[in-house]
């Protein structure tokens, strides 16, 4: 059951869904839908995204399922990524809240954030996986000083030039490494983005 559809971003639409188990329990999930330009891109993106199912880290959002679906209304293929849902929002909302209240994020929280994100990035980089879209809205807040990386992007979809241009025009360019404007991604791109996010946190 779909509970909510969030405003679409340059690289997809995010849904909040609820699944009822046989025992009657209700679990919330986030589902990201990304449009694919053709069947080949969908296959490549799905193959890339399967690596996300193998990630098991306390500071990385758990991916539950991946599938490709056809939307008759727009006659297009969509890659769907089902992931863990955090009821506490994301880092972007936390930063905005602090700014509205003219409050600072405590140094201890910032230090824990940095340690958790460095550890999470080191974990994915060892497996030759890059995040490619690291920014505050893609970092989930799971506790007072607990955070999770979320919303990874696949290379196949990030190289869709039309979506890329839209993304560059949005605020996310504030966290993008210089080389990513030329469609190049490495582990250094993620580190650059993390530094920008850290600066954003400290400038509340």
Residue ranges, per PLM feature:
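Catalytic-loop of the protein kinase fold
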Residues: 125-141
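Glycine-rich ATP phosphate-binding loop
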Residues: 13-36
């Amino acid at each position: 059951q779909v509970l909510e559809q969030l405003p679409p971003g340059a690289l997809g639409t995010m849904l909040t869904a609820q699944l009822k188990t046989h025992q009657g329990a209700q679990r919330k999930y986030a589902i990201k839908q990304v449009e694919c330009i053709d069947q080949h891109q969908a296959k490549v993106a799905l193959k890339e995204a399967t690596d996300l199912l193998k990630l098991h880290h306390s500071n990385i959002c758990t991916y539950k399922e991946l599938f490709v679906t056809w939307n008759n209304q727009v006659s297009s293929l969509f890659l769907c990524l089902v992931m863990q849902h955090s009821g506490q929002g994301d880092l972007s909302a936390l930063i905005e809240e602090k700014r509205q209240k003219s409050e600072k994020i405590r140094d201890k929280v910032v230090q824990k954030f940095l340690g958790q994100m460095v550890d999470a990035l080191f974990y994915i980089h060892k497996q030759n996986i890059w995040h490619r879209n690291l920014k505050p809205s893609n970092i989930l807040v799971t506790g007072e000083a607990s955070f999770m990386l979320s919303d990874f992007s696949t290379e196949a979809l990030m190289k869709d030039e039309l979506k890329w241009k839209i993304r560059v025009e949005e605020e996310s360019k504030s966290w993008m490494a210089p080389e990513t404007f030329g469609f190049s991604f490495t582990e250094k791109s993620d580190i650059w983005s993390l530094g920008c996010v850290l600066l954003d946190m400290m400038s509340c």
